C-alpha cells in the first residue's frame, strides 16, 4: 500500500530558509526512530521520497521520516548548498535549519533521539556528509549516495572541480575536517556509502575519499575490509561502522529495486538493488529484503543532472585524476577480483 504523502510543517529557527516535510505512519509509537532524507538537485522532497521509497519503508517498519526541501530562492537548481561555508558551518545556514527540524520533530512526536539517521543523494548526499560532520551528536548513522566528502569544496568553483575528481588528501586530512567541524570526540555515526562506477556527474573517487574520511574518523584500517557481492554490487565493510557499495552498472542516482520499495524516476535508477532497504538494515531498522526470482532489470543510465551551472567556469576546469591511496586500491582490487576491471 502506498505510504501517505509527506506533509509540510512549521519549525524554527530557520536561518537557512528551508521547508520541512514529515511523515508519521499511522499508529507510530513513542520512541520510534527518525530518518532524515535529503533530495538532489532539481528534485523535491516528495518526489525524491516517492522514488527512493523511504515513506513506504517507514509505514512497513515503524519509523518517522523528515524531508527538508530546498527553495529556489536559495539555489536556482534547488540544490542544497553543500559547498557554501555559511551553510555548512555548525550553528549557521542550512545545516542549522536541518538540525532545528530534527529537534522539533523528535520533541513534538516523542521520537528516540538516539536513533536518528540521515541520507541523501548527490547534493543531498554532500549535505548529508556536512550534517554528519557539523552535528554528529544528533545521528546514529548516515548514508551518502553519489555524494562527496565533507570539506571537499568551499565555493562553486571548488564544487565543480570536486565533482569531476575529489581533491587528493591523506585519510587523516579528511578525518581532521570532520573532527574540526563540531569539536566532537565521539561516538561517531555509522556510515554507508553508495556510488555508481558509471557516474559521470560525481566521480566515483569521491566515494573513495568518503571511505578514507570516515575510516579515519572511526579509527579503522582500510586494509581490514571484508569484501562480498550483493545483488550485483561490490560491498566492502568494516564491521558495523562503515560500508561502501560500488555498483558497476549504475550511473548518477539512487539505486532501487522496483520489486521492493520505490519507483524509477530521473536519478532514481532501477538496477536490481534496494539501497534504501539495505541502508535501513545497516542502521538496524530492517532485516534484508527476501530474495526475488524476477529477472534483474537492465541498467538505466541517467542524463546529467541539474548541478550548479557555471559553464564558463566548468569549461576551464580540466579533469584531474586524484587517487586516494588505500580506499581506491581496495575498490579497484575488488572490481578486478570479480572480473569487472581489467588487470
Stretches with model-predicted labels:
Residues 1-34, 46-53, 60, 64, ...:
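A domain-start/cap signature at the N-terminus of enzymes
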Residues 37-40, 67:
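Structural cue for short, hydrophobic secondary-structure segments
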Residues 39, 120-122, 196:
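Conserved alpha/beta-hydrolase "nucleophile elbow" surrounding the catalytic nucleophile
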Residues 40-44, 250:
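Active-site glycine-rich loops that stabilize anionic/oxyanionic intermediates
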Residues 69-93:
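Cap/lid segment of the alpha/beta-hydrolase catalytic domain
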Residues 86-109, 130:
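Alpha/beta-hydrolase active-site loop
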Residues 106-108, 113-184, 200:
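Primarily recognizes the serine-hydrolase "nucleophile elbow" in alpha/beta-hydrolase
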Residues 193-195, 199:
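Short beta-strand/loop motif that positions the catalytic acidic residue
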Amino acid at each position: 500500500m502506498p505510504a501517505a504523502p509527506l506533509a509540510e510543517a512549521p519549525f524554527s529557527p530557520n536561518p537557512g530558509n528551508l521547508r520541512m516535510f514529515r511523515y508519521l505512519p499511522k499508529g507510530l509509537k513513542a520512541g520510534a526512530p527518525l530518518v532524515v532524507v535529503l533530495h538532489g538537485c532539481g528534485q523535491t522532497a516528495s518526489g525524491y521520497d516517492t522514488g527512493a521509497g523511504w515513506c513506504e519503508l517507514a509505514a512497513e517498519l515503524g519509523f518517522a521520516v523528515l524531508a527538508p526541501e530546498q527553495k529556489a530562492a536559495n539555489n536556482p537548481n534547488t540544490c542544497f548548498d553543500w559547498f557554501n561555508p555559511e551553510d555548512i558551518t555548525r550553528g549557521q545556514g542550512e545545516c542549522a535549519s536541518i538540525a532545528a527540524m530534527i529537534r522539533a520533530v523528535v520533541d513534538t512526536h516523542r521520537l528516540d533521539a538516539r536513533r536518528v539517521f540521515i541520507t541523501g543523494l548527490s547534493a543531498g548526499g554532500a549535505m548529508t556528509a556536512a550534517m554528519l560532520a557539523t552535528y554528529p551528536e544528533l545521528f546514529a548513522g548516515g548514508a551518502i549516495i553519489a555524494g562527496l566528502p565533507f570539506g571537499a569544496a568551499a565555493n562553486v568553483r571548488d564544487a565543480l572541480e570536486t565533482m569531476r575528481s575529489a581533491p587528493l588528501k591523506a585519510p587523516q586530512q579528511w578525518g581532521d575536517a570532520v573532527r574540526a567541524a563540531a569539536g566532537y570526540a565521539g561516538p561517531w555515526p555509522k556510515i554507508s556509502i553508495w556510488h555508481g562506477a558509471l557516474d559521470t556527474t560525481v566521480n566515483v573517487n569521491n566515494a573513495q575519499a568518503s571511505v578514507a574520511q570516515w575510516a579515519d574518523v572511526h579509527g579503522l584500517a582500510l586494509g581490514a575490509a571484508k569484501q562480498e557481492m550483493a545483488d550485483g554490487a561490490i560491498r566492502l565493510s568494516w564491521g558495523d561502522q562503515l560500508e561502501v557499495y560500488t555498483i558497476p552498472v549504475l550511473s548518477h542516482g539512487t539505486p532501487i529495486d522496483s520489486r521492493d520499495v520505490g519507483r524509477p524516476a530521473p536519478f532514481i535508477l532501477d538496477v536490481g538493488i534496494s539501497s534504501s532497504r539495505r541502508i535501513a538494515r545497516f542502521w538496524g531498522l530492517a532485516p534484508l529484503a527476501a530474495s526475488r526470482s524476477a529477472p534483474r532489470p537492465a541498467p538505466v543510465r541517467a542524463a546529467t543532472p541539474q548541478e550548479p551551472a557555471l559553464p564558463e567556469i566548468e569549461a576551464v576546469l580540466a579533469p584531474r585524476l586524484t587517487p586516494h591511496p588505500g580506499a581506491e586500491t581496495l575498490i579497484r582490487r575488488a572490481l578486478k577480483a570479480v572480473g569487472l576491471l581489467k588487470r
